[in-house]
Amino acid sequence: MIQTFFDFPVYFKFFIGLFALVNPVGIIPVFISMTSYQTAAARNKTNLTANLSVAIILWISLFLGDTILQLFGISIDSFRIAGGILVVTIAMSMISGKLGEDKQNKQEKSETAVRESIGVVPLALPLMAGPGAISSTIVWGTRYHSISYLFGFFVAIALFALCCWGLFRMAPWLVRVLRQTGINVITRIMGLLLMALGIEFIVTGIKGIFPGLLN
C-alpha cells in the first residue's frame, strides 16, 4: 500500500493528462472575456467558484464513476474506448486551434450573457470539467481503484484545481506576455499530448475487449 501511495509517475501522468485535457491556458482568454464586466474582487470570486466546482465534479467522478458504470451495465473497457475517442476528438479541435469552443454549445453561450454567476456554468462545466475530463478521471479511477491510488488522485485533482486558480489569477498578465500566438502554440502542444493519451485509452480498451470476443 505504501508503494502505491508513492507511485508518483502514475499521479504525474494523471495530472499532466488533466492539464492537457482541460488546457487552462487556452481557457484564459475565455475567462477574461466572461469576467470583463466584473470588479477584481468579483473576478477572484468567480475564479475560486469555478476551480472549486471543477475539483468537486472530478472528485465525484473519481469515487462514484465505477458505480455509475455498473448501474448502467457499461464495461470499463467499452468506456475506455468511448472516452479515448472523445479525448482524441477534443485533441483534434485543440490542434486545429479552436481553443475548446466546441465544449460549449450555442444555447449555453446565449445563456452566459444573462447569467449572473458564471463560475459553475459554463466555466467549470462544461469548459473545464467537461465530458473529456470526467471520462478520463473515471478511467483512471477504475484502472487504479485501491484506496491509496484514489487518495493520490484526490490530491492530484486538488493540486490541479489550485494550479488553474493560480493561472486564472494571473490571467491578464499571461495574456499580455504570451499574446494570442503563444496561447495558440501551447494549446496545440497540449492537443498533441492529449491525442497520445486518448489513443492509449483506446488501445487499452481494445486489449481488454478482444480476449472476451475470442472466447
UniProtKB/Swiss-Prot annotation:
Alphabetical UniProt keywords: Cell membrane, Membrane, Transmembrane, Transmembrane helix
Report which residue ranges the record marks as coiled coil: none
Compartments where found: Cell membrane
Where is this chain primarily localised? membrane
Q: Name one GO cellular component term.
A: plasma membrane
Q: Which domain of life is it from?
A: Bacteria
Family of this protein: Belongs to the UPF0056 (MarC) family.
Q: What NCBIfam families does its record include?
A: NAAT family transporter (TIGR00427), PRK11111.1 (NF008320)
The UniProt entry, under PANTHER family, shows: UPF0056 MEMBRANE PROTEIN YHCE (PTHR33508:SF1)
Mind telling me what this protein is named? UPF0056 membrane protein YhcE
Organism field: Escherichia coli (strain K12)
Q: Which gene encodes it?
A: ychE
